[in-house]
Amino acid sequence: MATGEKKPETEAARAQPTPSSSATQSKPTPVKPNYALKFTLAGHTKAVSSVKFSPNGEWLASSSADKLIKIWGAYDGKFEKTISGHKLGISDVAWSSDSNLLVSASDDKTLKIWDVSSGKCLKTLKGHSNYVFCCNFNPQSNLIVSGSFDESVRIWDVKTGKCLKTLPAHSDPVSAVHFNRDGSLIVSSSYDGLCRIWDTASGQCLKTLIDDDNPPVSFVKFSPNGKYILAATLDNTLKLWDYSKGKCLKTYTGHKNEKYCIFANFSVTGGKWIVSGSEDNLVYIWNLQTKEIVQKLQGHTDVVISTACHPTENIIASAALENDKTIKLWKSDC
């Protein structure tokens, strides 16, 4: 059930229309976004673990420790359906590029591929020997990559459900896996303190990113253009890396992240921001270039474990743990 938020009159009056002269092709990043709470989505009965917008922008998928996936309208927060079948809690969910399929990663040691329109499980991917924690489709959506507490990364064939490769990737649980934009590379992160880049075709490790220190790496993803890698570590830090040079370019701090694997995002529909949840129950938004905190979103009553940015609109989805169990949709003018 989604509940709408009323906008105070004064706030609406402050939102002046932008003069048309500034409507150039490549807009400079505005000073600050103005994300405001629009909807609160309630339905999960345990901690929410992950939220992801469909690539076509229509839907939001959420996964939870309650073993369920829920689908919601991306623009109105309207509940659409529940997808069930896992025996234990789900840590992650991801969409195929055509927005027709979902893959989920569960503590029951399996991944499942779902047809979203029917809610049917098409394939169960078996092979990991411990909790499956993270998953993603490649852009072509013929492959799935998964990471597990068994310390391995696996590459799966979507059509057959067979495991094509098992990478002995890390020496501790794998916290995140992500393909770059042409699917040729995979980045993985782990509690062992490493970020590794893999050649998808051969399964070879091409690069290991190491900084001075090596706190557990709790999340990683490629930037939309594939040149950079955003990595979160459990010392309250997000870092932007130049992948080819193996150099850290930017550091984002001010949030709290010492315990949980919290998702982070590149927001590119308006200004260029970095977005992350936090253990102080807030959503943090940084200016990507200047590294300044430009907004903090207040409303959740527990750790904000997951955030997602809409593919075309200035919309953020956020989700929180056990004491909250809700998903919130926020919208900004820039």
Curated annotation (Swiss-Prot):
Record key words, sorted: Acetylation, Chromatin regulator, Isopeptide bond, Nucleus, Repeat, Transcription, Transcription regulation, Ubl conjugation, WD repeat
Gene3D superfamilies given in the database record: YVTN repeat-like/Quinoprotein amine dehydrogenase
Major subcellular site: nucleus
Site (Important for interaction with histone H3): D107, F133, F263, E322
Compositional bias segments (type: Basic and acidic residues): 1-12
PANTHER family xrefs: WD REPEAT-CONTAINING PROTEIN 5 (PTHR22847:SF560), WD40 REPEAT PROTEIN (PTHR22847)
Organism listed in the record: Bos taurus
Encoding gene, per UniProt annotation: WDR5
Protein name: WD repeat-containing protein 5
Function: Contributes to histone modification. May position the N-terminus of histone H3 for efficient trimethylation at 'Lys-4'. As part of the MLL1/MLL complex it is involved in methylation and dimethylation at 'Lys-4' of histone H3. H3 'Lys-4' methylation represents a specific tag for epigenetic transcriptional activation. As part of the NSL complex it may be involved in acetylation of nucleosomal histone H4 on several lysine residues. May regulate osteoblasts differentiation.
One Pfam family from the record: Beta-prop_WDR5
Polar residues biased stretches: 17-28
Superkingdom per UniProt: Eukaryota
Keyword S-adenosyl-L-methionine assigned: no
Gene Ontology, cellular component aspect: histone acetyltransferase complex; histone methyltransferase complex; MLL1 complex; nucleus; Set1C/COMPASS complex
